[in-house]
């Protein structure tokens, strides 16, 4: 695990974005941890979040021309990632996002920002069922652009209804790489370094054993 990944986990814990305990997920599973990126909700949070996304993006080595943030949660993520790439990595990258409702006046349409073209890096908070990715693929394809990859904050590395995860389904269906700032494996490594969190470590390991990919 790299330094920025450890820092991201601590950032998420401090903001209570990442919690350990017992949580019932939409799937009905009882999870030993919960991740709610919506709690990154201040200016400082967004500035730091952008740095972590930019770091993971540069670390991945994936070539891309434009950042796309699907409405709604992806919009501030794309924006802050673009700012961080410019400020900390000297990369002035165009960005774009969509509206849920088409605008009928002014410039019109469903897209805001730079023209949607070239190799697109889609940024979002998490992938649960892959629905937002599929909707975004229709938008990206309609503009003649191609998907370079997908970047999210956390990969839970757990099976969906099938034997593979929603992320693996996206990679299979769209022939792209999905990268994340951290994964469930990274959370386990972090917990292994914290003796005072041994109970949580045992619970997360058991969960991975049951639902992991």
UniProtKB/Swiss-Prot annotation:
A Pfam family assignment: Pribosyltran
List of residues binding orotate: 34-35, 128, 156
Catalytic activity: orotidine 5'-phosphate + diphosphate = orotate + 5-phospho-alpha-D-ribose 1-diphosphate
The protein, known as: Orotate phosphoribosyltransferase
Subunit structure: Homodimer.
Family from the record: Belongs to the purine/pyrimidine phosphoribosyltransferase family. PyrE subfamily.
Gene that encodes it: pyrE
Gene Ontology terms for molecular function: magnesium ion binding; orotate phosphoribosyltransferase activity
Residue sites binding 5-phospho-alpha-D-ribose 1-diphosphate per the record: 26, 72-73, 99-100, 103, 105, 124-132
